[in-house]
């Protein structure tokens, strides 16, 4: 996973202040997140699966809200 994709997913799930929230959700430090984003360390493969679960959860929540707005 590239730092760019990590940033895109983080912003899509949590909005503009995504880094700290995503760090908490993944149980990693803010420093680890910054190192992934800077390309200092690779994003572990397991994080991709965790991000998929988080994104799917956000999508379900949004779908419920959208349904209520109809």
Predicted ranges, named:
Residues 59-70:
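Short, charged recognition helix plus adjacent turn
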Residues 40-53:
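Short, basic-rich loop-to-helix N-cap that marks the start of a DNA-contacting helix
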Residues 15-16, 41:
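Alpha-helix boundary/capping and short turn/kink residues
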Residues 1-15, 57, 61:
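A short, Lys/Arg-rich alpha-helix, primarily the initiator
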Residues 17-21, 46, 64:
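Alpha-helix N-cap and coil->helix boundary residues
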Residues 16-34:
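Short alpha-helical DNA-recognition segment
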């Amino acid at each position: 996973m590239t730092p760019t994709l990590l940033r895109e997913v983080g912003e899509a799930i949590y909005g503009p202040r995504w880094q700290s929230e995503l760090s908490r959700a993944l149980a990693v430090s803010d420093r680890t997140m910054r190192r992934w984003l800077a390309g200092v360390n690779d994003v572990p493969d397991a994080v991709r699966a965790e991000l998929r679960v988080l994104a799917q959860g956000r999508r379900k929540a949004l779908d419920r809200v959208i349904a209520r707005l109809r």
